[in-house]
Curated annotation (Swiss-Prot):
The lineage of its organism: Bacteria, Pseudomonadati, Pseudomonadota, Gammaproteobacteria, Aeromonadales. Disulfide bonds: none annotated. The gene is tuf1. It holds the Pfam family GTP_EFTU_D2. Gene3D superfamilies: P-loop containing nucleotide triphosphate hydrolases, Translation factors. This is Elongation factor Tu.
Length: 394
């Protein structure tokens, strides 16, 4: 393959395979890379290259993840695949691999299984916006009615968790046959790729979203005023614009009178940049780490939310013992810890290290948050859990 085929100017989209163990997620991942490499160039990955997933650490949690990439005519995709169920749980909750859309793999020979359901639920909780279904192993099912039945079951399950089950794309294929080079089944991989291109919208870039910067530090500069520093998470702030300081205390409105980076003055600060923002009429003691600087009205402070949490195992450096209702750890958001209490789901008395659990958290001070915000749970500075805000309550 000639080298110059690979262009970085295509839109970039993050996807991944999810679904029950042994339903063919890794085989499908290999098949996609092989079939698309034939058609559009790029690297083909073999099954065992993907299956030997390297260990990564995200917020102190050990996760095995394989990353592959592939191209279609119009897009470049980064694709994650995990070997084990626990890796999926951790990956989705920590946001180690943010997905703009997921390919749910369901074996036609089995239909939906317990982890199929759990991955759909997790996808809903952590805010994966789009699902495409790949019904795998269809070469092993001769009965058309059985295929219809499995498809119906999967669609109903997705609808149950608020995905548009009736409308989302379902592809019937055989990852193994496609990987072996069977042209008819390769066609199904192309069909899947077409759905990726058309069903998952191009993700909004961080720079196009409303301005937000978590405040890391606050300085007072004689004769100039108060400067807050941090890395711009999203959007752009221009000199002269009104911004809000949100979280911990009452929301305050102020004007950004200067932006500097590496001691140079700029007209604006953009997503991804580490900046200092000079704020008009704000006292040093009125601002603190853990608040955010944001476009007015774009984000609100909250104290109560439903979350999905993964509790670190003892081996990962987490707790050695379970915790119970009334547990009061620190919740670390962006740049600071806030104490909070938890409510466990009905019928759940305790949570063991290594579990994942839905819990309602009430913080003692408000934090600027939206659904999808990630956090860590800490005890005395050591991380014992990772979570994501599934939905804000108050």
């Amino acid at each position: 393959m000639s080298k110059e085929k690979f262009e970085r100017n295509k839109p970039h989209v993050n996807v991944g395979t999810i679904g029950h163990v042994d339903h063919g997620k890794t085989t499908l991942t290999a098949a996609i890379t092989n079939v698309l490499a034939k058609h559009f160039g790029g690297k083909a990955f073999a099954f065992d290259q993907i299956d030997k997933a390297p260990e990564e650490r995200e917020r102190g949690i050990t996760i095995n993840t394989s990353h592959v990439e592939y191209d279609t005519a119009i897009r470049h995709y980064a694709h994650v695949d995990c070997p084990g169920h626990a890796d999926y749980v951790k990956n989705m909750i920590t946001g180690a691999a943010q997905m703009d859309g997921a390919i749910l793999v369901v074996a036609a020979t089995d239909g939906p299984m317990p982890q199929t359901r759990e991955h759909i639920l997790l996808g809903r909780q952590v805010g994966i916006p789009y699902m495409i279904v790949f019904m795998n192993k269809c070469d092993m099912v001769d009965d058309e009615e059985l295929l219809e039945l499995v498809e119906m079951e999967v669609r109903e399950l997705l609808t149950e968790y608020d995905f548009p089950g009736d409308d989302l794309p379902v592809v019937r294929g055989s990852a193994l046959k496609a990987l072996e080079g069977d042209a008819a089944w390769e066609e199904k991989i192309i069909e899947l790729a077409n759905h990726l291109d058309t069903y998952i919208p191009e993700p909004e870039r961080a720079i196009d979203l409303p301005f937000l910067m978590p405040i890391e530090d606050v300085f007072s500069i004689a004769g100039r005023g108060t400067v807050v520093t941090g890395r711009v998470e999203r959007g752009i702030v221009k000199v002269g614009e009104t911004v809000e300081i949100v979280g911990i205390k009452d929301t305050v409105s102020t004007t950004c009178t200067g932006v500097e980076m590496f001691r140079k003055l700029l007209d604006e600060g953009r997503a991804g940049e580490n900046i200092g923002a000079l704020l008009r009429g704000v006292k040093r003691e009125d601002v603190e780490r853990g608040q955010v600087l944001a476009k007015p009205g774009s984000i609100k402070p909250h104290t109560k939310f439903e979350s999905e949490v993964y509790v670190l195992s003892k081996e990962e450096g987490g707790r050695h013992t379970p915790f119970f209702k009334g547990y009061r750890p620190q919740f670390y958001f962006r740049t600071t810890d806030v104490t909070g209490t938890i409510e466990l789901p009905e019928g759940v008395e305790m949570v063991m290290p290594g579990d994942n659990i839905k819990m309602v958290v009430t913080l003692i001070a408000p934090i600027a948050m939206d659904d999808g915000l990630r956090f860590a749970i800490r005890e005395g500075g050591r991380t014992v859990g990772a979570g994501v805000v599934a939905s804000v309550i108050a």
